[in-house]
Design a protein with these regions (language model features):
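Short, glycine-rich nucleotide/cofactor-binding loops
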Residues: 7-19, 149-159, 300-305
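Glycine-rich phosphate/nucleotide-binding loop
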Residues: 117-144, 224-228, 232-341
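Glycine-rich phosphate/diphosphate-binding loop of Rossmann-like nucleotide-binding domains
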Residues: 18-20, 32, 36-38, 43-44, ...
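Phosphate/nucleotide-donor binding subsite
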Residues: 55-100
Length: 342
């Protein structure tokens, strides 16, 4: 029998809370029997949302009442310290105390990043936990690491990102010997800023990863690499541009297919193929971005996430747990640290 995974969902985080997180929780426990969802937030508000649903396994949704909410504009470090009874802090503490295996939130990115490191804690040997979302490509998906957690990363941090990303892609996505590339302004080794130039030789010499060199932004959608390594500023720009282009592309296609009678007739013929193609550009299909290298599972979804994205993030947590991703990353980093000490 499969292990039951307890996933905390921040019911108060995001633009569409509490309706969408609660809906996601109901859908998740209805679809799968190996999940218990713990909703953190104001109990009366959550119960009111739950009352809108019927015929779901109520015994697998729990509520932990909290009295505070961390807003997006609040300074993250101060908010984590001051708002001990917030839905984010309480949820992360449940993971820390091993009363849950994972935490999912659409709330304040800064608070989740700070709280993940301060409350849940980094695995031994991990210097900087990166945010690592999957992005669609012509060949499937690639992992973009880091996309927002470490703006001032150093070369050794990027090397660790490459290692963690390789473990993720091999064990979660199932890609053997995943290709690792560093984002650069050209394919040549001598190109790039100081960070890229210092990191490149370290990645070349790094055992255990399949480093293929630099990748330019235009080649990312083609799927030339499985693990895309960069510091957070670059990664976040790539991610936001990717999502913006995907959204615009979908709107343009829909508008073009509806502009006249001839186009509408043609649309009926190609609708199934277009629908399937457009689905691959929908960020909600890929769940959230895990904060890798922690002692517990923490996944950040978009602030505007709907139930479908949050539900997929919950399922993501189950897969992470089953594949023991955190344990594998921790073991690799401890092995690396021990090797250096020796």
């Amino acid at each position: 029998m499969a292990e039951t995974v307890r996933v905390v969902v921040d019911a108060m985080g995001g633009d569409n809370a509490p309706a969408e997180p609660v809906k996601a929780a109901v859908e998740a426990v209805t679809e799968r029997e190996d999940i218990i969802v713990i909703l953190t937030g104001r109990q009366d508000v959550i119960e009111n949302e739950l009352s809108k649903f019927q015929n779901y396994p109520k015994e697998r949704i729990q509520i932990v009442n909290t009295s505070e909410v961390i807003e997006t504009a609040e300074p993250p470090v101060l908010a984590i310290r001051k708002k001990k009874d917030s839905s984010i802090v309480v949820g992360l503490n449940l993971v820390k105390k091993q009363e849950a295996e994972a935490f999912v939130s659409s709330g304040s990115s800064g608070a989740i990043l700070v709280g993940g490191q301060v409350i849940v804690g980094r695995s031994k040997g991990v210097q900087r936990p990166p945010l690592a979302p999957l992005i669609p490509t012509q060949k499937g998906v690639s992992l973009l690491i880091d996309c927002g957690a470490n703006v001032d990363a150093r070369p050794e941090h990027l090397v660790q990102f490459a290692k963690m990303g390789s473990i993720y892609m091999e064990d979660v996505v199932g890609i053997k010997n995943p290709r690792v590339a560093i984002v650069n302004i050209g394919a040549e080794e001598e190109k790039g800023n100081a960070l890229v130039k210092e990191t490149f030789p370290l990645l070349k010499e790094c055992p255990g990863i399949n480093f293929i060199g630099s990748i330019e932004a235009r080649d990312i959608p083609a799927g030339y690499a499985d693990v895309i390594v960069c510091e957070a500023f670059v990664g976040n720009v790539i991610l936001k541009l990717y999502e913006g282009l995907g959204s615009t592309f979908m709107k343009m296609i829909k508008t073009g297919l509806m502009k006249d009678t001839r186009s509408k007739v043609g649309a009926l013929l190609v609708k199934p193929a277009i629908k399937e193609t457009l689905k691959t550009f929908d960020a909600s299909e890929y769940g959230g971005a895990p904060l890798l290298g922690l002692k517990g599972l923490v996944v950040k979804t978009h602030g505007s996430a709907r139930a479908v994205e949050i539900r997929h993030a919950i399922f993501q947590c189950v897969q992470f747990r089953q594949q023991k991703i955190n344990e594998k990353i921790a073991a690799h980093m401890v092995e690396e640290t021990t090797g250096k000490e020796a």
